[in-house]
Amino acid sequence: MLERIVLGLGSNKGLSDEMEFEPVQILKMAVIELQKIFLPKDFFYSSVYKSKAMYYEDQSDVFNMVVSGFYDGTPQELLHQINEIEANFGRNRLNEFRNGPRTLDIDIELFGEKIVSDANLEIPHKKIKERQFVLIPLLEIFPKCAEPISGVLFSDILAKLPDQGVEFFCKLDL
């Protein structure tokens, strides 16, 4: 069954190979890769926002955005696909520390109206309601979106959060 998915993307660490890719370039390339796993119709992506890192602050600013599209598969299948995309952009889950710098971090924020609580996956994302860096870009593309468990509008949740210094950075040109 087709489900509308919302993914949160973040990057604050460049990728070196033959070329140097900065975080915003990584986000742009990740959006292009993510378009391949979603149905082509009704694929949306937000602007890029910049903020200080949360939880572990001794690192570079983080660039965040959300993407949304329709997906024909299970949450676990999607998790596997996004983990592969993260790895292709240099993420090594075995050699990183929690909330540390990332070349690319992709979180499943929403999977239609599904509620999932597994050992390796929680949907809606367990921290979505505390993260302005997710809520601001989410509301940019879906201003009337509601939290599926409580039904509370994300705009109302955002209004109650303290300022976390999330700033508009740029629109991507794909």
How should each PLM-predicted stretch be described?
Residues 12, 45, 137:
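Residue-level signal for inorganic ion chemistry
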Residues 15-16, 147:
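Acidic/polar residues at beta-strand termini and the immediately following turn/coil
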Residues 7-13:
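Generic N-terminal amphipathic, Lys/Arg-enriched alpha-helix
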Residues 17-23:
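Short, flexible/disordered intra-domain loops and linkers
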Residues 54-62, 76-80, 84-174:
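Flexible, gly/pro- and Lys/Arg-enriched active-site loops
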Residues 23-75:
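Short, surface-exposed acidic-centric catalytic microdomains
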Residues 2-6:
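Extreme N-terminal starter segment of soluble prokaryotic enzymes
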